Amino acid sequence: MSERVLMKGNEALAEAAIRAGCRHFFGYPITPQTELAAYMSKVMPKIGGTYLQAESEIAAVNMVLGAASAGVRAMTSSSSPGISLKTEGISYMAGSDLPAVIINVQRGGPGLGGIQPSHEGFLLLFHDVGDHLVVHTSVVQFQLCLPHLLVGIFAGYIVGD
């Protein structure tokens, strides 16, 4: 039986992506997902991957778009306000049927000053700028579903086409 390891949620997401074959990470630091990017910055060079801190959220998602267009397994992550900046790039990827993993590590405020629950990032599931499905797993499902979900996405499966 394999050894059990206790790690933070951000690090577990990064490790799941790596085990699913992700070798390219493009991101921009924003709390609370900075730990995910920091983990990728340590591990990617050790496995022959690419870690690049972009100059903005928009640049990061467009780097993922370029990588996905070239047929490589790439991902980015952000937090709710950063995901808002990435929606145009996300829509281009969806419209082009390009697989990518985009992690939204949600937080409360500052956009609405905390008048909505801290899970307001879920609104993006239904009100994005494109007409495409967003694959979403709830937190309780991560241990069982996430690695398999990432493998499916990286393999190029388009859900709901």
PLM regions and their residue ranges:
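Thiamine diphosphate
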Residues: 1-125
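N-terminal low-complexity segments that are often proline-rich with Ser/Thr-Pro
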Residues: 128-161
